[in-house]
């Protein structure tokens, strides 16, 4: 049996302020830092040993991962940072307050943007793209103007196939510290959740979710720590 642990980053300033974040690189709050320490302590109590940790290129996930690795005394582990594990890109909604958008566009429309598998949020214009050097080296197509959860799912899965799954098949436990929507996409895949069923899945900040996997990487058990 191999273990896959998924953890959403601790509370960010955008979580605290109730704004859409996406690829905006916001820091953790003091609460988020405490959540990361607590997640690490809960993981330490399990005694799990990991082969590698995977995270995004956004600081809220990277800092959470490093705090957790310190708590479990495994800071020496290989740490793989990839844009493919970035949060879903919320397009022109980024930085906007969620309550304000509900008032402006209506609750039903906002719910579709946030939770639907296929609905794409309002897009950034080409002029509004950041052209961040973290992404430009991969080509213009990498930095999206906005994404549905399906689009995020499609960019995550190649990383799962090429980097995470082979290590699990080799018997190495893996730790993934990422974001709410991207972890929902991975959970959809692992648990075979339908396109409509995924809208009800929530991932809390700083709560380790451990999947027990058989030799074919089928889920045979699940725990939250």
Swiss-Prot record:
Catalytic activity: (2R)-2-phosphoglycerate = (2R)-3-phosphoglycerate
Keyword Isomerase: yes
Keywords: Gluconeogenesis, Glycolysis, Isomerase
Site entry: Transition state stabilizer: 179
Class of this enzyme: isomerase
GO terms assigned for molecular function: phosphoglycerate mutase activity
Cross-referenced InterPro entries: His_Pase_superF_clade-1, His_PPase_superfam, PG/BPGM_mutase_AS, Phosphogly_mut1
Similarity comment text for this entry: Belongs to the phosphoglycerate mutase family. BPG-dependent PGAM subfamily.
NCBIfam families: pgm_1
This protein's name: 2,3-bisphosphoglycerate-dependent phosphoglycerate mutase 1
Species in which this protein is naturally found: Lactiplantibacillus plantarum (strain ATCC BAA-793 / NCIMB 8826 / WCFS1) (Lactobacillus plantarum)
Lineage: Bacteria, Bacillati, Bacillota, Bacilli, Lactobacillales
